[in-house]
């Protein structure tokens, strides 16, 4: 059986960064692959590169334009990114993004003689994203084995049953993940918007660990956010 030679599907977000650092402890040969699919939050790719440079992991960015399909505020700037309070998270789905990403990772595995793909769906993702279910990845793994030439290909999804707060706990206490070098916000600004679903989930994960998000350095702002999470009911 081949040793674990892997590629991480890397977005540059907090969960993804933790996945990268976890994979680095398990692999003898590790690469990272990101997609520039026309996302408005392109800053995440800058963070992905910084993360990989920091631990000397080869990083490739593939341009694969998904804006032609429209329908998601992540790729269509004429649409507003919904605040979490609007309960419209399903509108942020980018159709078949994870299928495309996994397929590109499989092709990368063939090129570089790798046999494992790490992807980062989490427990919270299951509510809104059909392509974050375990059955999806089990089926996709079999499809990629049958349709390609890496017949022992494995898709690892170590966080699929893990809550985001526990991912941050792992990254902070065990892996020393530099969360200040990550980007989660769906907006494309210089600072996180603090109201979109991605921001609120990130903030909650830090609050529940008794930590201050390094992307929100202002103490008063953080305390207000913390109280909004703790006393939201």
Q: Where are the regions that the model predicts?
A:
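ATP-dependent adenylation/nucleotidyltransferase module used to activate substrates
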Residues: 1-175
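Local cysteine-cluster metal-coordination motifs and their immediate loop/turn environment
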Residues: 103, 183-204
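Charge-dense, low-complexity polyampholytic segments
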Residues: 117, 186-191, 211-219
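Glycine-rich nucleotide phosphate-binding loop and flanking beta-alpha elements
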Residues: 125, 206-207
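Short alpha-helical linear motifs
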Residues: 145, 209-210
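Short, charged low-complexity linear segments at domain edges
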Residues: 159-186, 224-231
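Short Fe-S-cluster ligation motifs
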Residues: 200-202, 206, 212-233
């Amino acid at each position: 059986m081949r040793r674990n030679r892997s590629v991480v599907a890397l977005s540059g977000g907090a969960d993804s960064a933790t996945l990268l650092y976890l994979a680095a402890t398990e692999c003898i040969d590790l690469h990272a692959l990101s997609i520039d699919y026309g996302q408005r939050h392109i800053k995440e790719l800058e963070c992905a590169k910084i993360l990989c440079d920091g631990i000397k992991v080869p990083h490739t960015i593939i341009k694969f334009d998904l804006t032609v399909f429209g329908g998601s505020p992540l790729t269509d700037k004429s649409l507003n990114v919904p605040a979490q309070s609007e309960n419209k998270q399903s509108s942020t789905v980018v159709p078949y993004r994870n299928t495309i990403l996994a397929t590109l990772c499989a092709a990368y595995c063939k090129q570089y003689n790798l046999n494992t793909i790490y992807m980062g769906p989490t427990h919270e993702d299951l509510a809104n994203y059909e392509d974050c279910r375990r059955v999806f990845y089990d089926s996709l793994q079999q499809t990629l084995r049958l349709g390609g030439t890496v017949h022992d290909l494995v898709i690892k999804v170590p966080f699929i049953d893990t809550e985001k707060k526990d991912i941050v706990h792992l990254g902070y206490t065990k892996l020393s993940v530099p969360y200040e070098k990550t980007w989660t916000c769906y907006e494309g600004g210089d600072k996180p918007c603090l109201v979109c679903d991605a921001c609120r989930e990130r903030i909650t994960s830090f609050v529940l660990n008794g930590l201050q998000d390094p992307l929100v350095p202002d103490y008063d702002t953080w305390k207000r956010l913390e109280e909004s999470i703790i006393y939201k009911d």
